[in-house]
Amino acid sequence: MDIKVLGPGCANCKRTVQLIEDVARDRAVPVTVIKIEDMREIVGYGVMSTPAVVIGGKVVHAGGLPNRAKVEQWLTAG
């Protein structure tokens, strides 16, 4: 499963990447986290608030750190 984390490299962006990787490891779900820092590409997703998370081409989260339960839901739904 490919998961894109959109953001300029801010602290919450880095924590979002780490949270996704931690939950994936705990759940034994293979994921590839792709960090997107190019603002043109981020805006192309219609995102104005970061970090944002994109799964399957859809923005599933934007703005602030997602909680662990939400990340678990993404990984089990995929």
Describe the residue ranges of each PLM region.
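Conserved hydrophobic residues forming the short capping helix/wall of the S-adenosyl-L-methionine
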Residues: 20, 24, 75
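Local sequence-structure signature of Cys/Sec-based thiol-disulfide redox active-site neighborhoods
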Residues: 1-19
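Structural micro-motif
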Residues: 46-53
